[in-house]
C-alpha cells in the first residue's frame, strides 16, 4: 500500500481531517505555522491526530532554524545553519552544530512530533531559497557541520532527513514556484553538490530529493527519477533509509502531470512516502487513485522514523543542564 503524508488547515481537526487521517494509505502528517496557536493546543492537536489515524502516524515539521522554523513561541530560536560560519574556531563550530541539532530535535520531540525534515545538505551557491539554510558554500565544510548536527539529533533520539538530493543549491529558480533546471553533468554534480550526501550516507535515516531537473542526466526531476533514486541512491550509495518525496503540490513537481500522475511517478521512481500539502483536493485525488503498492520494506523504513520512546515534556527539558548548555549558541 502507498504511504501518504498530508497536512491540515487549522489548529483543530475537522471532521474531514479525521476521515482522511483514518484512510489506510495515510500514515504521515506534516505541520505548519498555521497549525500552531500555543504549546497546549499543539500537543492536543497531535494527540487527536494520532487517535484519528488508522495506523502509527509519522508527524513531521520543517524546523531547520533561521527562516525555516514553523513554531516560535515556547521554542528556542534556532539560528540558521549558515550563521555557524561566524564562529571562527572550528572545534567550537562543530560543538555548536551538535548542540543545535540536539536542541532542535529535543524540543520538537518534547511536544510529540517525530521528526523535523533536517538537515539541509545543499551547497550555498546561487539559490535564494536555499541561501543560509545551507551550512556552507564548501561541500567539505557542509559534511563536517552536518555530521555534528546529525549526531546531536541522534543523541536526542530523532531520525534525520538529508535534503534536497542530489543538490538544490546550484540553481537560481525556487522549486516551490518554478521548475528549476541544472545543466551540469553528472561528473560536475558528483564533484560538488553530491559530496555531502556521499560522505554522510551512513548517518542519514531519510533523504528528500529535489524537485530539480538535471537534463544532462535525466529528463525527470530527481524525485521522479529512477536513475537518481534507484541507480544512484539505492544501488550505488547503498542507501537503505526512507526516501520522502518533496511536496507534490510544488510547481517543480508539475512536470509529472496531475496529482495522481505525480504520486504514481514518485512511488514508481522509489519514494517510500509521498507528501501532498496545501492541496486538499489533490490529497483526496491521490487517496482515491489506484496507486502502485510499496514493498513491505518500505513500510518498515517509514516506521523506523517514528520516535522510539516517549520524550520528556518541554518544561522538564528546559530544566536540564543539556538544554542550558545548548542555549549559549542562540
Curated annotation (Swiss-Prot):
PROSITE patterns: GLYCOSYL_HYDROL_F3 (PS00775). It comes from the Bacteria. It catalyses: Hydrolysis of terminal non-reducing N-acetyl-D-hexosamine residues in N-acetyl-beta-D-hexosaminides. GO terms for cellular component: cytoplasm. It is found in: Cytoplasm. Keywords: Cell cycle, Cell division, Cell shape, Cell wall biogenesis/degradation, Cytoplasm, Glycosidase, Hydrolase, Peptidoglycan synthesis. Its EC number is 3.2.1.52. Pathway: Cell wall biogenesis; peptidoglycan recycling. InterPro entries: Beta_hexosaminidase_bac (IPR022956), Glyco_hydro_3_AS (IPR019800), Glyco_hydro_3_N (IPR001764), Glyco_hydro_3_N_sf (IPR036962), Glycoside_hydrolase_SF (IPR017853), NagZ_Beta-hexosaminidase (IPR050226). The record marks 174 as: Important for catalytic activity. NCBIfam families: PRK05337.1. HAMAP family: NagZ. This is Beta-hexosaminidase. The gene is nagZ.
Amino acid at each position: 500500500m502507498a504511504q501518504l503524508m498530508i497536512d491540515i488547515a487549522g489548529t483543530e481537526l475537522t471532521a474531514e481531517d479525521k476521515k482522511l487521517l483514518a484512510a489506510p494509505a495515510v500514515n504521515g502528517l506534516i505541520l505548519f505555522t498555521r497549525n500552531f496557536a500555543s504549546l497546549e493546543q499543539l500537543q492536543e492537536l497531535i494527540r487527536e491526530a494520532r487517535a484519528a489515524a488508522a495506523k502509527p502516524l509519522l508527524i513531521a515539521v520543517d524546523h531547520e532554524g533561521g527562516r525555516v522554523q514553523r513554531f516560535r513561541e515556547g521554542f528556542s530560536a534556532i539560528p540558521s545553519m549558515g550563521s555557524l560560519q561566524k564562529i571562527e574556531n572550528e572545534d567550537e563550530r562543530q560543538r555548536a552544530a551538535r548542540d543545535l541539532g540536539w536542541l532542535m530535535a529535543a524540543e520538537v520531540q518534547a511536544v510529540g512530533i517525530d521528526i523535523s525534515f533536517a538537515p539541509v545538505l545543499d551547497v550555498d551557491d546561487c539559490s535564494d531559497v536555499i541561501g543560509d539554510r545551507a551550512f556552507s558554500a564548501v561541500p567539505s565544510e557542509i559534511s563536517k557541520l552536518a555530521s555534528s548536527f546529525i549526531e546531536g539529533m541522534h543523541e536526542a533520539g530523532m531520525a534525520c532527513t538529508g535534503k534536497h538530493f542530489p543538490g538544490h543549491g546550484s540553481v537560481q529558480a525556487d522549486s516551490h514556484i518554478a521548475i528549476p533546471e541544472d545543466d551540469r553533468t553528472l561528473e560536475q554534480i558528483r564533484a560538488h553538490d553530491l559530496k555531502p550526501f556521499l560522505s554522510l550516507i551512513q548517518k542519514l535515516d531519510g533523504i528528500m530529493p529535489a524537485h530539480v531537473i538535471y537534463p544532462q542526466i535525466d529528463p525527470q526531476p530527481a524525485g521522479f527519477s529512477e536513475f537518481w533514486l534507484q541507480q544512484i541512491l539505492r544501488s550505488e550509495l547503498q542507501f537503505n533509509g526512507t526516501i520522502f518525496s518533496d511536496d507534490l503540490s510544488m510547481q517543480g513537481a508539475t512536470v509529472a502531470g496531475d496529482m495522481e500522475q505525480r504520486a504514481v511517478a514518485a512511488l514508481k521512481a522509489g519514494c517510500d512516502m509521498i507528501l501532498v500539502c496545501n492541496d486538499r483536493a489533490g490529497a483526496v485525488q491521490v487517496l482515491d487513485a489506484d496507486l502502485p503498492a510499496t514493498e513491505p520494506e518500505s513500510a518498515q523504513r517509514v516506521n523506523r522514523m517514528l520516535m522510539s520512546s516517549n520524550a520528556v515534556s518541554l518544561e522538564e527539558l528546559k530544566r536540564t543542564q543539556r538544554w542550558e548548555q545548548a542555549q549559549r549558541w542562540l
